[in-house]
């Protein structure tokens, strides 16, 4: 049985900027001068006009411009919108506009806002994830236990550093290498995700021993017209492990482009279908690894071999092994403040899920009936508890995962705005906001809002699933006080580009806000 997933467009490289650069850029943008402005009381009519527009697609509109998108499909779509002024120590946020703000919606990746807010507050910005190697001192031959704790940033480079540490201690041969998968308990892959998603790199399994984001990359190159696309593995060694059923084709320069890659569930077989134009750029594809534990050990053996360290038997255990064996090598992840950048700015699902499980693992001792829960379920309990402590209404959301990839998540715009408001009052507020994409500058918003008044002024988390689009975050209008907002659309037949463009128009409308004096009659 093969499960297919789709990639239609080549994603442009995303710009990673330092935290300080992003924060300063957000605060120090020049004031945008415009004569086209609106009062807070005009937000509702302006949004209604946007949703009723009916003309042809264009690029992101400037503030005050009407888009040209046919939006007749919005008649049956569900919109959830909540716009508030940013609260301060002395004043609560004022609601400027609400449309079904308390209703449940599928949030897509906006769910990451809840996960990362709870993690940052509970674990601290300095929290790191440690991968350890322990030596069994009770045996003469060298037996090592490799303890993974779900570091999503671990790559082959870090495995090389671990191997160097072992070599520096004089280890030349390992009789048994045990991969310890017991830190995260629960099913792999995620049972809350759709079968098509778990085959793609963005839906890679989350376990204790994560390496290279548990995905393998390849490039699909167009050849001469009529010839199949050439498959090039990012790691040539993978070509020896996989068989490819290539039914793709190179087409002329005017034909449509699409690529479908399916992975067989029972064997290392990829099926490639679709077409790319002759002379065009290659299409990058990431495929989820089906056996992440074995993949980790296999690649660690390669790193050990590079240090002339021989390995005998390799095993994987999912059973906790409480021993007093000494730690002889270790490597740590970057701090949580850095991990959040990849999670929110680049909308990395695996990072979000690993952070969720870290929350659960760290709090396991304090949770009642923790043994009956998976580590992910424990993490969700901690998120709920932490957000409640921060003032988020407990009934305003129901989470099934930490990333938003599950279609069982239910989140109201009010829950997102309450979270954004709460975290803005905490000492870690600057770190949290700096992890978000900046309009026209970085991450998933790098290509949106360019050359508009929102560029550099809007920091928000994006979210996209089929028929779903969301944007929630902060906005500094040039002539009005800072805002917190959440905009979600569900159940729309419109293409993603149309949904995003419409959301962008609503956000751009907010940049035109100004204070208006009330009539005294």
Q: Model regions: which residues?
A:
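Beta-lactamase-like hydrolase cores
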Residues: 29-91, 97-103, 165-170
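Small-residue-rich helix-loop
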Residues: 96-98, 346, 356-521
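Polar, glycine-rich mid-to-C-terminal structural blocks
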Residues: 146-251
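A small/polar active-site loop signature that marks catalytic segments
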Residues: 249-430
């Amino acid at each position: 049985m093969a499960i297919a997933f789709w990639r239609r467009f080549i994603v442009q490289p995303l710009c990673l900027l330092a935290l300080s650069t992003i924060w300063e850029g957000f605060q120090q943008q020049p004031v945008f001068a415009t004569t086209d402005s609106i009062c807070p009381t005009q937000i509702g009519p302006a949004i209604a006009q946007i949703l009723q527009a009916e003309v042809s697609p264009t690029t992101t509109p400037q503030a005050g411009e009407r888009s040209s998108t046919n939006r007749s499909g919005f008649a049956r779509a569900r919109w959830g919108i909540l716009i508030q002024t940013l609260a301060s120590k002395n004043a609560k946020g004022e609601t400027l506009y609400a449309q079904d703000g308390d209703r449940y919606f599928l949030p897509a990746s906006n769910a990451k806002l809840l996960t990362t807010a709870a993690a940052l507050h509970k674990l601290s910005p300095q929290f790191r994830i440690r991968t350890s190697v322990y030596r069994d001192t009770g045996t003469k031959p060298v037996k090592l236990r490799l303890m993974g704790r779900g570091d999503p940033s671990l790559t082959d480079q870090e495995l090389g550093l671990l191997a160097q540490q072992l070599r520096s201690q004089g280890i030349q041969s390992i009789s048994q290498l045990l991969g310890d998968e017991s830190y995260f308990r629960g099913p792999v892959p995620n049972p809350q995700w759709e079968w098509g998603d778990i085959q793609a790199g963005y839906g890679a399994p989350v376990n204790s021993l994560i390496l290279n984001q548990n995905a393998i990359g390849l490039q699909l190159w167009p050849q001469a017209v009529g010839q199949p696309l050439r498959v090039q593995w990012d790691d040539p060694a993978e070509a020896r492990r996989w068989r490819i059923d290539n039914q793709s084709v190179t087409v002329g320069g005017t034909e449509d482009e699409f690529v479908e890659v399916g992975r067989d569930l029972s064997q290392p077989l990829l099926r490639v279908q679709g077409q790319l134009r002759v002379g065009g750029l290659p299409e990058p594809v990431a495929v989820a690894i089906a056996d992440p534990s074995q993949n980790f050990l296999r690649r660690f053996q390669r790193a050990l071999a590079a240090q002339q360290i021989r390995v005998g038997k390799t095993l994987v255990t999912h059973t906790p092994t409480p021993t007093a064996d000494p730690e002889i090598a270790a490597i740590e992840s970057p701090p949580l403040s850095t991990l959040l950048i990849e999670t929110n700015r680049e909308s990395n699902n695996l990072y979000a899920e690993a952070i969720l499980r870290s929350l659960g693992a760290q709090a396991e001792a304090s949770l009642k009936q923790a043994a009956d829960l998976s580590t992910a379920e424990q993490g969700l309990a901690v998120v709920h508890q932490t957000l409640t402590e921060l003032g988020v209404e407990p009934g305003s959301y129901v989470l099934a995962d930490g990333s938003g990839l599950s279609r069982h998540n239910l989140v109201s715009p009010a829950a997102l705005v309450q979270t954004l408001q709460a975290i803005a009052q905490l000492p870690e507020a600057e770190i949290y906001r700096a992890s978000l994409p900046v309009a026209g500058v970085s991450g998933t918003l790098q290509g949106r809002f360019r050359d508009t008044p929102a560029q550099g002024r809007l920091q928000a988390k994006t979210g996209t699933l089929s028929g779903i689009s969301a944007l929630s975050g902060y906005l500094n209008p040039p002539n009005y006080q800072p805002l917190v907002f959440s905009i979600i659309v569900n159940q729309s037949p419109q293409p993603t580009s149309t949904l995003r463009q419409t959301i962008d128009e609503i956000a751009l409308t907010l940049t035109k806000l100004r204070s208006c004096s009330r009539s005294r009659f």
